Regions:
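Divalent-metal coordination cores built from histidine and acidic residues
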Residues: 69-192
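Short coil/turn connectors at secondary-structure junctions
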Residues: 1-2, 40-42, 48, 52-54, ...
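Histidine/acidic residue-rich metal-binding segments in metalloenzymes
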Residues: 131-142, 167-285
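Histidine-rich, glycine-flanked metal-binding segment
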Residues: 1-5, 11-55
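Di-metal (Zn2+ and/or Mg2+/Mn2+) metal-binding site signature of metallo-dependent hydrolases
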Residues: 51-75
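Acidic, glycine-rich active-site loops and adjacent beta-strand->loop/helix elements
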Residues: 50, 62-65, 89-92, 240-241, ...
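Divalent metal-coordination and catalytic microenvironments
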Residues: 9, 24, 29, 49, ...
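Short, basic, glycine/proline-bearing loop/turn elements
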Residues: 53-62, 164-167, 260-265
Length: 286
């Protein structure tokens, strides 16, 4: 007898094969049969007329704060999502010094429209380093899996303080320290690094985010940390004001480090063909 059988659903297994009607059998924490007619079970979920699919992986979320206090992570868990990735757009809450907690809350509120009052109430700040933050996530029982990326803006503020907040150029020593911390984060389990270079991301005071004007030397230095760790992807959000220049440095970064570089594909009403053009340029640089 199986532990659970999902009975009579329309199964789409994610491989691209046509849908089939059948059962899915689960024993313990493993799916043991997909399709056909499963035997009896301790629990039967009737799925006639419903789709049965693998859990969705949402690669762009901002649960960085909520994941530290909420085991359910609604509404994602209500809609078939079983894995979420956060630390996107260069915003997050680690690494962090006590004196900069308010700045990181302000960034998240301004960039992602998450109320600062909720973040202030919910965050317990049981961490300083990014590995500490991952440990805090691991201690939280939860209904779905989570993964985190180390965000540029907290990293820059942690290393550079007010100079980082004010978008001053990073010194070689700053870059070396950001690289060291990034490598440590990735080795501890971070899925990569993200930054933002878009004018739509500003603080509540209307200032550009700390990493907006980061020079190529800084970004490459951080990217090398991913190469040294042998894992992780480099992600960014950009306005692509100079498309050729942006793609040129992204290509150099990927070739030098051996790590994948991705960017957020967005569109603009004033440039409706932008997303197609960016995809074409991206393919040309593969």
């Amino acid at each position: 007898m199986h532990d659970i059988v999902i009975r009579g659903g329309t199964i789409l297994d994610g491989t691209g094969v046509p849908a089939v009607t059948g059962d899915v059998a689960i024993d313990g924490d493993k799916i043991v049969a997909v399709g056909g007619k499963a035997g009896p079970a301790k629990r039967v979920i009737e799925a006639d007329g419903l789709l049965v699919t693998p859990g969705w992986v949402d690669v762009h979320t901002h649960y960085d704060g909520q994941a530290t206090w909420d085991p359910v992570l609604a509404p994602s868990s209500w809609h078939g999502v079983t894995t979420i990735l956060f630390g996107n757009c260069g915003v997050g809450f680690a690494p962090v010094r006590q004196e900069h907690r308010t700045e990181l809350i302000d960034l998240m509120e301004a960039v992602e429209d998450i109320p600062g009052t909720a973040l202030t109430e919910g965050l317990n700040w049981e961490w300083e380093s990014f590995p500490d933050y991952l440990d805090a996530l691991a201690r939280m029982p939860r209904t779905i899996d989570v993964a985190a990326q180390i965000p540029h803006h907290p990293l820059r503020v942690y290393v550079m303080g007010e100079r980082g907040i004010n978008r001053q150029a990073a010194t070689p020593e700053d870059i070396a320290e950001m690289s060291r911390l990034t490598e440590a984060a990735v080795r501890a389990g971070a899925f990569g690094f993200t930054t933002s270079r878009t004018y739509s991301h500003k603080t509540t005071a209307g200032e550009l985010v700390p990493g907006h004007k980061a020079e190529e030397a800084e970004l490459t230095g951080i990217g090398r940390a991913l190469g040294a760790a042998g894992r992780g992807a480099f992600g960014m959000n950009s306005d692509f004001e100079d498309e050729a220049r942006e793609f040129a440095w992204m290509t150099r970064l990927s070739k030098e480090t051996g790590r994948p570089v991705w960017f957020l594909l967005t569109d603009r009403p004033t440039d409706p063909g932008r997303w197609r053009r960016l995809m074409q340029i991206g393919r040309a640089h593969v």
